[in-house]
Regions:
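Conserved C-terminal portion of the radical SAM core fold
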Residues: 241-301, 319-342
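Short, positively charged and aromatic/hydrophobic N-terminal segments
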Residues: 51, 60-61, 69-71
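Hydrophobic faces of well-ordered beta-strands that scaffold small-molecule active sites
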Residues: 97-101, 158-160, 191-193, 217-221, ...
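Core AdoMet radical
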Residues: 125-145, 149-172, 187-200, 216-242, ...
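N-terminal [4Fe-4S]-dependent radical SAM core
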Residues: 70, 74-159
Length: 383
């Protein structure tokens, strides 16, 4: 290839500097958005040396022209963002569906280990389907979840999603029994384990690392915010540093790692939320979930809203939230997988915002707006 030839000899200092930078960065630029960014930065440098007749520089300019042609085609077929179904295709040949579980865990932020009362926004009823009841075993919940989905796709495979509360909070042997009970159910091909950043001991990581040699294991951390002042306000009981440490330790074991953040938490400005995208992008995350802040009946945050509504910005206008998400996505690392952008709570529990949209309807509106704005994931990403 042209850049292999360029590297063999350099005949002037200017070309030496530009060529070395070009070669080093080109070898690392494995994503179209990164390549495009490289083209712009290199061209800005090279244009000052266009009168140079070094053969190496001529080849660099030729490669840049070729890249420009490639980018012209790439712009027409550019993916708006990396979605979760496409991510799963890296691991599974057919359709895979997550089944949410309530395995009877609690939370160190509820039982006094870290704090009492839990996070101010939290009501686990909002994300547990009807079949998730703690009096049912993990296996029974999975079988009922399978029946719910199997009528549409008889060949479907499933991921056991340990979702409710903190699913790594317990004795190691008890945790192992729960996970292995799930994996013993027919057609369950992996685990997704939701937890807190401060609840991942090394002994459990050792076990999950070994388990992942034979099955799919994704660890999903509730990060919620990158600002410690916000984490204190919502009574999370952990810091941003704890989240960074947990993600890095997990990724170092070769495990896929997911993160979850909430947009619109009290006290956070639009600039705060957009700045968060850069912090999230620096983490070795594979997947990310976003969702809007929802006020849920019976939570401490709902009471706070009654007392100080001026502290909250609830995105009552869905188009305002879409505008934020578009700007956020553009600032994210180009290879990060985006699993979702909204959350849906039962109508009887939801105070606000109530958009009346299904997830797929929101995604359609988001994609439409991104196309109108010529926006895509990573467009404004700055390493």
């Amino acid at each position: 290839m042209a850049w292999e030839i360029v590297d063999k000899s350099v005949t002037c200092d200017n070309c030496d500097t530009v060529t070395f930078s070009f070669l080093s960065n080109l070898q690392r630029a494995t994503h179209p958005v990164l390549l495009e960014s490289l083209y712009v930065s290199v061209f800005q440098t090279v244009k000052y040396f266009v009168d140079c007749r070094c053969p190496e520089m001529m080849l660099v300019l030729l490669v840049i022209r070729q890249l420009l042609s490639i980018f012209g085609m790439a712009m027409e077929t550019r993916t708006l963002y990396n979605d979760f179904p496409t991510f799963l295709k890296r691991f599974f040949p057919g359709k895979v569906q997550k089944i949410s579980l309530n395995a009877g865990f609690t939370c160190p932020n509820r039982d006094g280990t870290v704090g009492y009362g839990g996070c101010t926004y939290c009501n686990n009823q909002t994300f547990n389907p009807e079949y998730c009841r703690t009096e049912k075993t993990v296996a029974v919940q999975l079988e009922e979840g399978k029946r719910f989905f199997a009528h549409k796709y008889p060949e479907m495979k499933y991921l056991a999603y340990f979702q409710a509360y903190t699913n790594t909070y317990g004795e190691l042997e008890a945790l192992k029994r729960k996970y292995e009970e799930a994996l013993a159910v027919d057609d369950v091909v992996g685990l997704v384990i939701g937890t807190r950043p401060d609840c991942m001991p090394d002994a459990l990581l050792d076990y999950l690392e070994t388990l992942a040699k034979g099955t799919f294991v994704l660890v999903e951390y509730g990060i919620e915010s990158t600002l410690d002042r916000t984490l204190r306000r919502i009574n999370r009981g952990h810091t941003w540093q704890a989240a960074m440490d947990a993600v890095e330790r997990t990724a170092a074991r070769g495990l896929p790692v997911g993160g979850h953040v909430i947009l619109g938490l009290p006290g956070e400005s639009r600039e705060d939320m957009l700045g968060q995208a850069a912090d999230i992008s620096r983490l070795p995350l594979d997947t990310l979930k976003l969702h809007q802040l929802q006020l849920i009946r019976g939570t401490r945050m709902a009471r706070e809203y009654e007392e100080r509504p001026e502290d909250f910005h609830l995105f009552d206008d869905v188009d305002e939230y879409i505008a934020l998400v578009v700007d956020y996505i553009q600032r994210l690392r180009p290879d990060l997988v985006l699993e979702r952008f909204v959350s849906q709570s039962p109508k009887e529990l939801l105070i606000a915002p109530d958009w009346g949209l299904k997830n797929y309807e929101f995604n359609h509106r988001l994609q439409k707006r991104m196309k109108e704005l010529d926006a895509w994931q990573g467009k404004l990403y700055n390493q």
